[in-house]
Regions:
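The canonical Cys-X-X-Cys-His
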Residues: 62-73, 231
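Electron-transfer interface patches adjacent to heme c in soluble/periplasmic c-type cytochromes
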Residues: 85-196, 208-224
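Sec/Tat signal peptide C-region and signal peptidase I cleavage site
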Residues: 26-32
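Electrostatic cytochrome c docking/interface patches
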Residues: 32-60, 71-82, 239-247
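N-terminal secretory signal peptides that target proteins for export/translocation
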Residues: 1-11
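Bacterial N-terminal signal peptides
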Residues: 14-25
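Short, aromatic-rich amphipathic segments at membrane interfaces
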Residues: 213-251
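Juxtamembrane interface at the cytosolic side of transmembrane helices
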Residues: 246-251, 255-278
C-alpha cells in the first residue's frame, strides 16, 4: 500500500469524526427545545450550571412552590445541597420542612399519588427529568405562558400547553396575565412594513398577546422572568447533575483530539521521509 493510500485510510475518517463532533453537539442543542404550541417559538433559554447563586435560588423556589406536588425522586437531598455548594445544616434548616428526612433520602415529594389524582384529575408528574424530555426552552416558556381563562377549572390556561391541568401556583408573584389584542404593522413582501401614501405604517389588529395587569403581582416582569430563569436552571441541573462536568471534560477531549491530530500529522511526515529514503 502506498503512503498516499495509508494517509487516506488513516486520516480522512479521523478528520471526518472531528468534523462531526461540533455538528453533533449542535443537533443535541437543537433537540433540547420542544414545540410551544399556541405560544409560537419557544423562548431561548441559556442555562448556567456554574452560577450557584442562581441554582440556589431556583432550588428554594422549587421547594417552596413546586415540591408539595411534584417530586424529584431521582435526586437526594444531600447530593443537591453538596452540588449547589450549600452547607448541609443550612440547607436542611431552611429548605427541608420534614425534620425526619435524612441527607441520603430521595426527594419523593409529600403528596400521595392516589389523593392527588382525585384532586387534580391526574397525579402531578415527577419532574426530575422534565428538562431532558421537554427541553429547557419549553420549561422556561411554559412557566411564563399562563393566562386568565374563566372556562377552565382553575381559571387559567397556558399557551404552551393548552388545557394544562396544573394551576398557576406562581400567580401571586407574576400577577394576573391575560390575552390581549394589539395593532401590529403589516409586513410587505419585501420584509419591510407597509405604509400608506403619507408614509404612515399600516397596521392590523392581532390577538393572542400575553400582558400582565399592572399592580396584580408581587414581582415586576423582570423580577418574575429572573425567578423563572433560576427555577428552570435548577431543573436543568436536576435532570443531569453531571452536565457541567461532562461539558467541561468534553472540551478537554476535543482539545486532545486536535493535539493528537497535529502530532499524528508530524509523525506521518517523519515516516514519509524515511519511506522516500528507501
Amino acid at each position: 500500500m502506498s503512503t498516499d493510500n495509508i494517509k487516506k485510510v488513516l486520516f480522512k475518517p479521523f478528520l471526518f469524526i472531528l468534523f462531526l463532533i461540533p455538528l453533533f453537539s449542535v443537533f443535541i442543542g437543537a433537540a433540547e427545545g420542544g414545540p410551544c404550541k399556541d405560544y409560537g417559538e419557544c423562548d431561548d433559554f441559556k442555562y448556567s450550571l456554574n452560577d450557584f447563586e442562581s441554582l440556589q435560588r431556583g432550588a428554594a423556589t422549587y421547594i417552596n412552590y413546586c415540591y408539595g406536588c411534584h417530586s424529584l425522586k431521582y435526586s437526594r437531598w444531600g447530593r443537591v445541597a453538596k452540588d449547589l455548594k450549600v452547607p448541609e445544616d443550612i440547607f436542611f434548616e431552611n429548605l427541608v420542612f420534614d425534620k425526619s428526612i435524612k441527607p441520603g433520602d430521595l426527594m419523593t415529594g409529600s403528596m400521595p399519588a392516589e389523593e392527588s389524582a382525585k384532586w387534580f384529575g391526574v397525579a402531578p408528574p415527577d419532574l426530575t427529568l422534565v428538562s431532558r424530555y421537554k427541553g429547557d426552552d419549553w420549561i422556561y416558556s411554559y412557566l411564563r405562558a399562563y393566562y386568565e381563562d374563566s372556562s377552565k377549572q382553575y381559571g387559567v390556561n397556558n399557551l404552551v400547553y393548552p388545557g394544562t391541568a396544573m394551576p398557576n401556583v406562581l400567580l401571586a408573584l407574576q400577577g394576573n396575565q391575560r390575552l390581549v389584542c394589539k395593532d401590529v404593522p403589516i409586513i410587505a413582501r419585501n420584509g419591510g412594513q407597509k405604509r400608506d401614501e403619507n408614509g404612515i405604517t399600516i397596521t392590523e389588529e392581532k390577538c393572542g398577546f400575553l400582558e400582565v395587569e399592572n399592580g396584580t403581582g408581587k414581582l415586576s416582569k423582570e423580577e418574575f422572568d429572573s425567578l423563572i430563569y433560576d427555577l428552570t436552571n435548577f431543573l436543568v441541573y436536576v435532570g443531569e447533575p453531571a452536565k457541567a462536568t461532562r461539558e467541561r471534560i468534553g472540551w478537554y477531549v476535543v482539545f486532545y483530539f486536535l493535539i493528537f491530530t497535529a502530532l499524528s500529522s508530524l509523525l506521518y511526515r517523519e515516516f514519509h521521509k524515511d519511506y522516500n529514503k528507501h
